[in-house]
């Protein structure tokens, strides 16, 4: 560390900065020999590609410190064999040893402790330490800021156990690395943040750092050695659009390098964490427990995507399979896609939500190398193949000087497509062939036919809750309905089939500053696509958008069995009372539903709200232990004694409680609430983990309005209901697209929001992972506002009007919300 750069990596959270929001945009590329011929020329061509992508990188106030650059190649066995006498040990045959590139503390004491921990773990895992090698570097060639945070860089050589094949060695090296990360980061070493293992493999090695592209061979001098050979080379130049550069966050990672942003990262992390409790693998056996947590906190979105790729690949899937699972193409509305390929995608949708966002991902395991584009094609990828079997792919054309007459074929990556080179089979594999091979792995279509149903397959309920017109005004008051909600939101939505449009600009107070009782929804704002992250036009690009979701207890993502698609498919997340009753009375396979009340006793005062939430969370845990797979969180039953818990608070509290408990993937959470009525309300509930939402009071309110003649005479109730549901669906798609997200499945649990005016303790406990840059009220204020609305609803008729509050959020009203220009 130094005064110039007081951090060893990414700075800690402070002020308005939070390292959870790290993203970057970059240049990627690779070069490979289709024949698998190793040469130093491939390495040098990779370096040249990296240098020619330098304009896609960046530097800060120090022009010699880059945002990060790196190169991945195959293990240069001939080079290490030649260096063996100087290293003091001989290297075994290729495939019988692994090499790790290790970033270590600069302090000698801390470094020796880290080395000792790694050596201990290697021995405990049954492998043999051959020795350590100081990686020859030239620190004088990099900028002063890069030097200030530069780790000590060594290589470790590990021999496999007798009779261990190379795939088993790769898995064991993975276990060793995960154990070393966990144990060293758990120490109190002052310089433990320097520790990082860029690669530990028997197939590949990574040279990377806080470098500019032209510095890579000056810093890592051995890359210029003619004996450093490879049949493939993956390179990356980083541009930290809104992040702090660091040595750890330079690409490539162990399997991928990435240009883009994973917009759904928080949700992907949460779901991966929830799945850990059921992970089983015959390849890992008991070692699977040593890999937890799978996703390493504190990494970038690309690093966490690589964590997921690494687990799924080493558990037995091919890299193209894994990439198609994590970043699927748009399949739902594609009528030209073969049914078997569509079945492949739908089966895996039951296992894993897409890691969504603009992305061009290049990947390799040291044998195959390729690239994948996101479903929207929002990042560039250009490739060419020469007559002598050289393949080049990069973020742009022209990264290598190749004569036109030497080019056999060239093109660009299309949205959702894969470009693949197999150096062992010595051939280029087309996207069509990759998808056909994946679709033929299992009888996915048959599994779906036998195990997946929709709501239409469930029997009709014998009883559906009808509208209670006598109490509707009381319930509207209790849930904070205003006259403006009815006339400005609900009526236009049900008349026109789309969300009402208003002019830009808000001159009303923030929820935390208002003197009117507020809904919890009003304390949240959705983040939106910015910098290099484009939004999507959900209308013109409807082919890539999807509202599909899957309800059911999730299986083990490391195995492919028919029971993994034992799911109930929902085509729309907002459901009617009739469809909710179908779910409430479901009796099919493992599906069993129960209702949990979202109510708190008003007489208990402000403290009762928190106690009731804790009780709700305990009830959810007990329901899971009792075998229930559908938990319906309901606030029906509001009366003089009970007030509703804010539905968003209850939903997020249960969702995060079950994630921490490791049982979230065993249940679907369905919200039956009188509170949600506009698009943002539904987006928030879904964004914090709801599988479906039943807005029973909004539906009853529309029915009451229809009954009272608020709609044109010729408008039937069926048309009113369908138009309202259509408006919510269209509004949700528009809301997803503002953040560059295409599918509901990715949006669920992704928490693409920031709070404004909620205090840190409330957010950390109930909305874990949500940004709260500006703090404010706590749970006691939320309880007070809920009680105020309840008291207003329960006032005797002679003490109050029968009307609702006027509102005044969208238009100034005398008794309504204050405006800047009243």
List the model feature ranges, each with a label.
Residues 2, 60-231, 235-237, 241, ...:
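Extended, highly charged
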Residues 2-9, 29, 128, 144, ...:
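Long, low-complexity, charge-dense
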Residues 2-39, 183-198, 203, 208, ...:
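Glycine-rich phosphate/ribose-binding loops and adjacent secondary-structure elements
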Residues 45-49, 249-298, 373-418, 428-456:
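Extended active-site and interfacial segments that coordinate phosphate-rich ligands
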Residues 58-60, 206, 224, 368, ...:
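Anionic-ligand anchoring segments at beta-strand to alpha-helix junctions in alpha/beta enzyme folds, i.e.
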Residues 66, 79, 295, 312-359, ...:
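Flexible, glycine-rich loop/tail regions that form catalytic "lids" or insertion modules at the edges
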Residues 71-77, 139-140, 144, 456, ...:
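Short, conserved secondary-structure transition motifs
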């Amino acid at each position: 560390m130094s005064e110039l750069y007081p951090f060893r990596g990414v700075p800690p959270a402070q002020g308005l900065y939070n390292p959870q929001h790290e993203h970057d945009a970059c240049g990627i590329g690779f070069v490979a020999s289709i024949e698998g011929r190793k040469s130093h020329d491939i390495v040098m061509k990779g370096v040249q590609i990296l240098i020619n992508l330098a304009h896609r990188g960046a530097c800060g106030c120090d022009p010699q410190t880059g945002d990060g650059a790196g190169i991945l190649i195959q293990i240069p066995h001939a080079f290490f064999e030649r260096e063996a006498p100087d290293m003091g040990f001989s290297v075994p045959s290729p495939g019988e040893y692994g090499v790790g590139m290790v970033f270590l503390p600069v302090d000698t004491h801390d470094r020796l402790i880290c080395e000792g921990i790694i050596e201990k773990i290697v021995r405990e895992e049954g492998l043999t330490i051959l020795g350590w090698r100081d990686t020859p570097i030239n620190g004088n060639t990099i900028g002063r800021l890069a030097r200030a945070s530069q780790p000590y860089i060594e290589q470790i050589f590990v021999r496999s156990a007798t009779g261990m094949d190379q795939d088993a060695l790769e898995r064991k090296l993975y276990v060793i690395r995960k154990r070393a990360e966990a144990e060293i980061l758990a120490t109190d070493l002052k310089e433990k943040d320097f520790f990082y293992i860029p690669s530990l493999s028997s197939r590949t090695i990574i040279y990377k750092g806080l470098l500019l592209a032209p510095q890579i061979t000056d810093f890592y001098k051995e890359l210029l050695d003619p004996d450093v050979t490879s049949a493939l080379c993956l390179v990356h130049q980083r541009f930290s659009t809104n992040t702090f550069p660091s040595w750890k966050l330079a690409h490539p990672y162990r399997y991928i390098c990435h240009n883009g942003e994973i917009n759904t990262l928080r949700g992907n992390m949460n779901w991966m964490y929830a799945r850990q409790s059921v992970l089983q693998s015959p390849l890992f056996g008991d070692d699977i427990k040593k890999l937890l947590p799978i996703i390493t906190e504190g990494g970038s979105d690309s690093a966490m995507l690589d964590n997921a790729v690494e687990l799924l690949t080493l558990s037995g899937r091919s890299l193209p399979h894994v990439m198609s699972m994590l970043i699927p193409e748009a399949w739902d509305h594609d009528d030209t896609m073969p049914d078997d390929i569509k079945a492949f995608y739908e089966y895996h949708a039951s296992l894993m939500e897409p890691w969504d966002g603009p992305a061009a991902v290049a990947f390799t395991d040291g044998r195959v190398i390729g690239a994948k584009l996101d479903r929207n094609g929002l990042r560039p990828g250009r490739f060419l193949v020469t007559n002598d079997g050289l393949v080049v792919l990069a973020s742009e054309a022209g990264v290598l000087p190749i004569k036109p007459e030497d080019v056999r074929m060239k093109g660009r990556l299309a949205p959702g497509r894969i470009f693949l080179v197999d150096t062992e089979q010595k051939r280029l594999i087309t996207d069509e062939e990759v998808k056909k091979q994946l679709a033929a792995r299992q009888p996915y279509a048959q599994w779906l036919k036998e195990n997946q149903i929709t709501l239409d397959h469930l029997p009709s309920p014998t009883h559906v809750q009808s509208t209670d017109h006598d109490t509707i005004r009381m319930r509207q008051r209790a849930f904070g309905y205003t006259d403006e909600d009815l006339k400005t939101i609900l009526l236009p939505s049900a008349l026109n089939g789309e969300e009402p449009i208003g002019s830009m600009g808000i001159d009303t107070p923030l929820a935390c500053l208002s003197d009117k009782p507020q809904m919890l929804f009003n304390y949240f704002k959705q983040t939106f696509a910015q910098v290099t992250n484009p939004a999507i036009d959900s209308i013109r690009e409807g082919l890539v958008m999807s509202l599909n979701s899957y309800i059911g207890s999730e299986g083990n993502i490391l195995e492919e069995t028919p029971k993994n698609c034992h799911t109930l498919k929902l085509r729309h997340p907002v459901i009617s009372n009739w469809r909710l009753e179908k779910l409430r009375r479901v009796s099919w396979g493992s599906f069993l539903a129960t209702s949990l009340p979202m109510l708190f006793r008003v007489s208990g005062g402000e403290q009762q709200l928190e106690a009731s939430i804790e009780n709700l969370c305990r009830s959810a845990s007990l329901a899971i232990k009792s075998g229930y797979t559908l938990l319906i969180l309901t606030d029906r039953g509001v009366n003089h004694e009970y007030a509703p818990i804010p539905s968003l608070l209850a939903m997020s509290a249960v969702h995060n409680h079950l994630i921490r408990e490791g049982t979230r993937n065993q249940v679907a959470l369905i919200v039956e609430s009188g509170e949600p009525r506009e698009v943002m309300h539904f987006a928030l509930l879904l964004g914090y983990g709801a599988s479906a939402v039943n807005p029973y009071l909004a539906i009853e309110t529309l029915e009451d309005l229809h009954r009272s003649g608020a709609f044109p005479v010729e408008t039937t109730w069926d048309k009113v209901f369908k138009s309202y549901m259509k408006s919510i669906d269209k509004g949700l798609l528009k809301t997803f697209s503002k953040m560059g997200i295409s599918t509901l499945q990715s949006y669920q649990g992704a928490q693409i929001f920031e709070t404004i005016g909620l205090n840190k303790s409330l957010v950390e406990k109930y909305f874990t992972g949500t940004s709260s840059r500006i703090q404010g009220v706590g749970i006691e204020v939320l309880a007070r506002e809920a009680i105020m609305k309840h008291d207003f609803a329960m006032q005797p008729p002679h003490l109050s009007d029968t009307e609702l509050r006027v509102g005044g959020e969208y238009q100034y009203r005398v008794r309504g919300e204050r405006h800047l220009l009243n």
